[in-house]
């Protein structure tokens, strides 16, 4: 293993500690935090690609699209169903006060750090959707499902690679609390399964983006509708 790859792995393993330290020095503006978080992800991903382009990393390039055309159509169908489901959920939150209250209580149970990263205003929602969700989807899938999974799989095997890369993925979210570390690790296993089944990093990236957009949309709509309800009361 070359020095640059050791530096890359060290960066990935120490990233959660850096994140915890930076939690104490947050910007007052949530939008500024979104930009900072996204920039950090792209810096790490840029370092990863630099190492790959100069042949430091002995891994194959990611497969972009499924080799079987029916898997492409299956992915499109699943995403279409997910979009329809998301529209239904958002409509229910907007119309039903009981559903809205359940959603808001669930977010409250997620902890302060989790609440703070979710958008409240329209500007925050747009930035969360177009910048944070896309950055997390692209960067984290390349880091965990492509690089880390491939690196671990070379030395251990598929099962250990799925679990190992997903655990590290979960640890990257330590700043949200240990409950979210476990949940995120489980999501990591799911995303790894998607990557392996569809044989496509693009499908995994889109799935990741949709998950984040869903969380941000639910939070924004619930808060917006609740605010309107209180104003009209």
Task: Walk through the language-model features, giving the residues of each.
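Small-residue-rich segments of transmembrane alpha-helices in multi-pass membrane proteins
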Residues: 38-48, 105-112, 187-199
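Transmembrane helix-loop-helix hairpins at the membrane interface
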Residues: 113-233
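Juxtamembrane helix-loop-helix connectors linking adjacent transmembrane helices
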Residues: 55-135, 154, 225-232
